[in-house]
Amino acid sequence: MSQKLILVLNCGSSSLKGAVLDNDSGEVLLSCLAEKLNLPDAYITFKFNGEKHKVDLSAKPDHTGAVEALMEELKAHGLDSRIGAIGHRVVSGGELYSESILVDDEVIAGIEKCIPLAPLHNPAHLLGLRAAQTIFKGLPNVVVFDTAFHQTMPEHAYKYAVPHELYEKYGLRRYGAHGTSYRFVSDETARFLGKDKKDLRMVIAHLGNG
């Protein structure tokens, strides 16, 4: 098999989740979870073919160290040369982004601009993104924004009942969260029911913390 695979990364302030997927079937070939990043006892756990093993990251306990360990794991299984692109979850794209986008310097600057809207998450996403650009040189990186799904809200839904100048001056408005999850659930529900998504009326509950 030589088809290209997709690597997806979800970086938190002290963690990194990753998976390698077959772009056609959606099958997860390898997954990983790095924990306690930026602490002396950082480590990353890999799962491949149903088996798990842990790699110590204490020598380089940051996001870059985790991505480097991931690259070594991919090489060990002959998957590194089959990665065709990298996808990144980013919590907030603010009003700048309403869809997924190919990463360039302008996009990185845009994510930085949105840090005040997600001060815990966006800096961590940028660390993982920059590490991926350095370690997986030449591969396209795409960011998927959690806020993008909710950018379809009409103006009366995303604006609060406060003076308009607060929106104009401070950008005070409603942003939805976990939009990537909601998009998946709504798409799968439409597929399961055999209906067009725009014809559905659904209440969706996001359970969990990620």
Task: List each language-model region with its residue ranges.
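Electropositive phosphate-/nucleotide-binding environments in soluble metabolic enzymes
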Residues: 60-64, 68, 80, 101, ...
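Glycine-rich, N-terminal phosphate-binding loop and its surrounding beta-alpha-beta segment
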Residues: 49-89
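Residue-level signal for inorganic ion chemistry
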Residues: 10, 34, 86, 146
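Short glycine-rich, Thr/Ser-proximal phosphate-binding strand/loop in the N-terminal lobe
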Residues: 15-60
